[in-house]
Amino acid sequence: MQKMQMDTRVRRCTGEYKGAPVNGVSRKKEEHMAENFVLKGNICYSQNSRALICVEQGYLVCTDGISAGVYKELPQMYAGFPLTDYGDRLIVPGLTDLHLHAPQYSFRGLGMDLELLEWLNTRTFPEESKYSDMEYAKRAYTIFAENMKHSATTRACIFATIHREATELLMDLMEETGLKTMVGKVNMDRNSPDILVEETEESLRETRQWLADIKGRYRNTVPILTPRFIPTCTDTLMEELKKLQMEYELPVQSHLSENKGEIDWVKELCPWSEFYGDAYDHFGMFGNGVKTIMAHCVWPPEKEIQRMKENGVYVAHCPQSNTNLSSGIAPVRTYLEQGIHTGLGTDVAGGAGESVFRAMADAIQVSKLRWRLVDETLKPLTAEEAFYLGTKGGGGFFGKAGSFEEGYELDALVLNDESLKHPQPLSLKERLERFIYISDERHIDAKYVAGSKIF
């Protein structure tokens, strides 16, 4: 068999920014570079939202952190690679969480009887103010980072708080986990409690200092520009953040059309905008050459959907949070049919935990409710589609991630379902579907990120 040619240009797709180390690799961290190896087991991965590939007792080949493909028989040219045989276990791509809030991890599962804006004022903002205390931040973020390390998540886009030093601490801790993450210092200079609101110049100065402090510091962790949402950011702040975005070529994350009250509020604040997303687009932070994630997207008008498609915006679908905070049910079937980039977000603490498998199950369930109660022309999501959203769908924001196709960074989970007893044999697809609904971190035997074994 002829040796495959690998394109080294895709080997470190980490959402880099100007000032990041070359290929996202810090010179201090070079000893952690991935090796060549083969994993054997029952392998499942997505090619697209409708094509789930399952290979029984297949071989997954890794060359310098990159997938060289999945094979039923191991090609001779890889025969000398170290091989780990995982027997009857499932091997699937690592999961991507496109939206969660690290400082909210401490109150997950609380305040779920409130709607969004009340929940922010009574739960979220008081908790986030505590991160001005570095001792508290260290205790809380250490718990978060450790639990993320042992979860099924291999890549994540994370909101921190307005506090620069605590944000840098969070990035330090996430770097130690070995996961690939984008972390953002939050910007907010209006309509916020006194304990959290920044002066516009202060917000910009601290953001610039944050970017300077972390330059060249990490291999796996990169910054993402994080204006919380339009209601908490003045026009001046947004205009100046756009200049920073252009200077550092930063990706952007924020919230969009989560709640009807929020949408009305944005219309009051930005009466010149056609729709919520148009306000972001006005400031140059809505795709169109800028890698952008918008979380929720529950109530988009048709023009907003078209703009997201035209601009290549990523949707972070957060089904559990949208349910807990009574926000609504996002039209994910529409997003898939329109070809809009879509992945999943746990949205801790709007979501009660960090399980992206749980987010897959929630996405299926709420799509059934939308189909039955709102629009019977929009078919519910299938298990294959939900799995795609949690792997390749969201992984695309990081470049070539979330699949075992040749040329993709190799993020993998080894799943052990021996404890999930069944009276008869199940197909690989059936076993995977069970993991979506009833698995937890105890079923993960091994975890790899870009070819490096985490545990």
Protein language model regions, located:
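His/Asp/Glu-enriched, well-ordered alpha-helical/loop segment
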Residues: 282-288, 333-421
